Amino acid sequence: RAKYEYQTTMGAGRFEVRNARVSVTGNVLPSVAYKAEIDLSDEGQIKMLDAYARLFPTKGLTVTAGQMRVPFTIDAHRSPHQQYFPNRSFIAKQVGNVRDVGFTVGYTLPTDVPITVEGGLFNGSGLTNQKEWHKEVNYSAKARFLFTKGLNLTLSVQSIQPEEVRMQSYDIGAYYETGRFHIEGEYLYKQYSDNAFKDVHAVNTFINYDLP
């Protein structure tokens, strides 16, 4: 994903390769899947993004272990080719952008209204500090409700402590798709332990229309 940006306040521009991702997915067995994804140029840096194995023990149940994006928010889970704009929203890029190493369990409830719940435990220190030992619990959970065709409601909660300050985040988002329209809104609230920093409020809303 190459782009050119011009900063009006500076009167300067730049070319940039924002992403050049390569992904490999497959199944070792019908009930065992894997994924490995690397970004060959994340603003000029090579980054290993995903490296995990996923089990499907029974219908509707998934168990995942490895390096992955944690279950949190709507927009942060979109790959670059799924983004609606050249740049990601602040929720996806700065406030809710978390990849980590850990273990998750997901389950799709056998109900009339499709409900998928996923939660997991993680190191809480990101992708590069995997050798550190942790005493604190770092978790993230997400629930998705598909009330009707095209209507999605997502609720998320996350609690991590990468260093001395614990961060607690809550997110609610929804989108509706009808015809060529995609209407979406998302709100994220983040607070820090012991009032270490001011609370964070982030909002992402947009309407997209696909041209014929």
PLM regions with names:
Residues R1-G124, K135-Y139, R144-N152, F206-Y209:
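Outer membrane beta-barrel
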Residues M48, D75-S79, N129-K131, M167, ...:
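Outer-membrane beta-barrel and related beta-rich outer-membrane complex signature
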Residues H134, R144-P212:
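Detector for outer-membrane/organellar transmembrane beta-barrel domains
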